[in-house]
Amino acid sequence: MSFFDWLFRKKPKQNIPQMPSWESIVEMMRYKHLDAFADEVVNVIYSQDCSMRYVILKGENGLFTYQLEAIYQYDEDEWKYICSHDNALPAMWEPFRGIVGKSVFENTNDLLKELKSEPEYKQYF
């Protein structure tokens, strides 16, 4: 094979698996990516349909905080690209509406009281 043949040869078509249903994605994503946090994960509270979660974290200083996350499903183009990687998931957890900063608490009781007063908690949990 000459250099130009090798350079301009067509790449074989890659079989792209079909995007799973939303219910399958939600089930797949449960308990995933909890190791991505720098702080210790103390508890995880899932919404009624399990598409959202509150992750309660404990920092090195002993203080607690939480983060609300929602499942982001990749679109078709993203899925085509991601499928080329091993162990690819069709979605990822991301901070809900991009909100990352939360208050810091000395104990989990105060944290849970604050968490339960949030409108997202009242609506989805």
Question: Model segments located where?
Answer:
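A short, exposed loop/beta-hairpin motif centered on an aromatic-Gly-Thr core
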Residues: 40-41, 78-110
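Low-complexity intrinsically disordered segments
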Residues: 114-125
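Amphipathic, interaction-prone secondary-structure segments
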Residues: 38-73
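Surface-exposed beta-strand edges and their flanking turn/coil or helix-capping segments
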Residues: 69-70, 79-82, 120
